[in-house]
């Protein structure tokens, strides 16, 4: 318990230093209102509805405090929020934030790729749920479907392309993890990862590798995938993301996933950064 309290204190101390420009409640309120209007086009803190007190707490915290933490752009914040909600399968909230993402400049192709990126992490059925939700937003906005194709590989090139990406981002792959799997089928899983994850998905257009790595870390944070968070820290660094950007991304996830999952990811970032 003492360890958890200590970690919380460290996280909060870092957040407070990043939000030094917010000096009183009125500053927080004004920032909240501005961000909310930019994202959704409406008014925050209306005091209306069935639970106005909780909505005030939620909106001030997310849009007045979390949105002021770190060096992320509004586009990055909304892509992170959308991929977190897709991973959690909180589809009504995903629909709202998909609209917000478009409002702050995320293109339809980028948003679709954010959804497609979830497939290797959470499986095809849940990815399709998220895609269907985002497609509803596209249709409501008159965006014609299907969108422009973004595939970059063929049957002949997917392995070579995937291996090139994997070797650059994760030298050594997962060979040691799959050693000893019965029937030698660990080798099949290794090839699936290379061909499907890196070849079919990571090579696609619209999102660059740096963005894919950052968003992937947010998925793993949401899933509390401790082992993969260690390795994907280095994948992010190899792609050009700084430890500070990774930290800000995890904090952006925090209001949606809660403190325990976020603190675990922040602890891992701290451990890997210190090595």
Language model features by range: what are they?
Residues 73, 107-110, 208, 240-244:
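Helix N-cap / loop-to-helix initiation motif
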Residues 45-112:
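Ordered, small/hydrophobic-rich secondary-structure cores
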Residues 76-85, 114-115, 211-220, 249-253:
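Short, structured motif recognition centered on aromatic/hydrophobic residues
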Residues 1-4:
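Positively charged n-region of N-terminal signal peptides that target proteins for export
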Residues 6-15:
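Bacterial N-terminal signal peptides
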Residues 113, 122-125:
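Substrate/cofactor-recognition hotspot
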Residues 16-20:
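Sec/Tat signal peptide C-region and signal peptidase I cleavage site
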Residues 21-74, 127-209, 231, 238, ...:
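Acidic, glycine/proline-rich low-complexity segments that act as flexible tails and inter-domain linkers
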């Amino acid at each position: 318990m003492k360890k958890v309290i200590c970690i919380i204190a460290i996280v909060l101390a870092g957040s407070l230093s990043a939000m030094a420009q917010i000096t009183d409640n009125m500053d927080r309120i004004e920032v909240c209102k501005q961000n909310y209007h930019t994202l959704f086009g409406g008014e925050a803190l209306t005091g209306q509805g069935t639970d106005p007190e909780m909505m005030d707490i939620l909106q001030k915290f997310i849009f007045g405090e979390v949105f002021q933490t770190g060096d992320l752009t509004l586009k990055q914040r909304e892509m992170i929020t959308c991929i977190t909600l897709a991973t959690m399968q909180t589809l009504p909230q995903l629909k709202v934030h998909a609209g917000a993402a478009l409002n702050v400049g995320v293109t339809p192709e980028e948003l679709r790729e954010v959804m497609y990126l979830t497939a290797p992490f959470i499986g095809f059925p849940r990815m399709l749920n998220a895609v269907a939700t985002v497609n509803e937003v596209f249709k409501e906005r008159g965006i014609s479907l299907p969108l422009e194709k973004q595939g970059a590989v063929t049957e002949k090139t997917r392995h070579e392309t995937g291996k090139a990406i994997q070797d650059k981002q994760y030298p050594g792959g997962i060979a040691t993890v799959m050693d000893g799997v019965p029937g030698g089928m660990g080798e099949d899983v290794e090839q699936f990862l290379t061909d499907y994850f890196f070849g079919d998905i990571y090579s696609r257009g619209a999102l660059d590798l740096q963005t894919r790595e950052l968003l992937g870390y947010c998925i793993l944070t949401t899933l509390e995938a401790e082992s993969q968070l260690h390795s994907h820290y280095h994948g992010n660094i190899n792609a050009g993301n700084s430890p500070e950007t990774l930290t800000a991304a995890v904090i952006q996830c925090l209001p949606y996933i809660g403190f325990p999952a976020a603190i675990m990811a922040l602890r891992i970032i701290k451990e890997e950064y210190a090595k």
